[in-house]
């Protein structure tokens, strides 16, 4: 009888251990839309956000000046609080915002990223990008900042995830470009050596806003010089004022940005404008 009791207890122990192991391990869906609430609301307990393939307990809340769940008299925040397994990480913003949205994206290799978009007035973005937990630093870090890629060449920039394929993320940027006005450009980022990196300097132009229409056909507002390749000084041709062109592609590297276009059947690259006072095309929508 004692042997039978001992065998039953051993079997029960093994079942408990097995059950705990199964519940502790998890595999995230590719995308999970998250709710941002107070520090006591929307606590998630079914997903891995630290990248160790184990379930984490986490939630995302907003706050003001280091105080969670607080906002100013106008309803604005300047902090995002990410609480993971009883530890809280604060994202501070120099710009006040009135709300935020978040999603959890996971690559094929199991690496999770939090997508956070804190929205402020006039469609600007105070905090906007992909964030991940850095095990060596033991804190949340920025993986991709959507607001900085086109610094110096756009008045504002936003971005969203349009596709995940394996370990590659396609990001669609919406920007108010000094050269093209309102336009949409996509870049791919792939996981390599522990980081999300752009796969190319060449971005795909999706469209340009031309009034109520989307297009790639524009008209030169002034004489423009086209080069044979981005970053070179070899001239390809000169575009006359008033001439029609077709915008093809963009190139962004370091502090430089070039735009590929077709003019009279020939292809060339122009330097992107760095200020909206030096407009290159006459029929695009510019908003400051």
Residue spans for each PLM region:
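SH3/SH3-like beta-barrel superfamily modules
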Residues: 238-287
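Calcium-binding loop positions in Ca2+-binding modules
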Residues: 46, 50-54
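Sec-dependent N-terminal signal peptides of Gram-positive bacterial secreted proteins and lipoproteins
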Residues: 2-24
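Beta-propeller blade repeat segments, especially FG-GAP/WD-type strand-to-loop junctions
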Residues: 70-92, 128-139, 187-192
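Short aromatic loop motif centered on NTY/YTY
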Residues: 99-130, 139-215
